[in-house]
Regions:
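Non-catalytic DNA-recognition/assembly elements of restriction-modification systems
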Residues: 1-16, 20-32, 119-132, 148-190
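A short beta-sheet element
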Residues: 32-94, 103-106, 111-115
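Short, flexible active-site-proximal loops enriched in glycine and acidic residues
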Residues: 86, 101-107, 123-131
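Amphipathic alpha-helical coiled-coil segments
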Residues: 138-152
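Charged, alpha-helix-forming regions
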Residues: 194-195
Length: 196
């Protein structure tokens, strides 16, 4: 069944500032646009929810956050209604690319009123669970592949040093030159199709 975002969640705001979290030693986590910030003695949300960055850099980025936690004021709570799993709502919101609704040049913002009418297919709870499970598996595979790429990058750098050494030790006795010695700067090419 096609529904709107506003049919499956309520919005709420936070009055917490990042300074409210600094140097506190509470029990309940607080999150900001970049993730975990710290812990305080109270929480705003008793159930799992979705948070979206609504102000500043990273607008539209979403997080699925646990019960008994809070976010700071640059984020907005999207509180799932009884007809949707929090994780399913998270993937729906993430797939909508809500950053397209931004306004403001200096500090971009997005507002619930602008994206609340986005439509998607709401399936039954069993199907939601299946979809969430598949998407989590895909995300895990993507994370593993990205980790593997980082390791390959480190391997390439290490092999390069093994083959050519470093500038400081230059154990192979290579000539040390500046880029101007071995490259030509081409400022402007031909403005016609070359003839071969």
């Amino acid at each position: 069944m096609r529904v709107k975002i506003e049919d499956v969640c309520d919005k709420a705001t936070s009055n917490l500032k990042q300074s409210d979290v600094m140097n506190k030693k509470g029990l309940f986590p607080v999150f900001g646009a970049a993730g975990y910030l710290g812990k305080i003695d109270t929480f705003h949300q008793s159930k799992p929810y979705v948070a979206i960055v609504k102000d500043g850099a990273g607008i539209g980025r979403t997080m699925l956050l646990p019960a008994k936690s809070s976010v700071i004021g640059t984020m907005q709570y999207l509180l799932p209604k009884d007809n949707i799993l929090p994780a399913y709502l998270y993937y729906v919101i993430k797939a909508r690319h809500l950053e397209k609704y931004f306004s403001g040049a200096t500090i971009p913002h997005i507002y619930f009123k602008d994206y609340k009418n986005e439509q998607f297919d709401l399936v039954n709870f069993e199907k939601q669970k299946q979809i969430v499970h598949k998407l989590k598996v895909i995300e895990k595979i993507m994370t593993n592949l990205n980790d593997e790429l980082k390791l390959f990058d480190e391997l390439i750098k290490a092999r390069f040093v093994e083959m050519f050494g470093t500038l400081s030790d230059n154990e192979n006795g290579f000539d040390v030159v500046i880029i101007d010695d071995v490259c030509s700067l081409i400022k402007d090419g031909t403005h016609q199709t070359p003839q071969y």
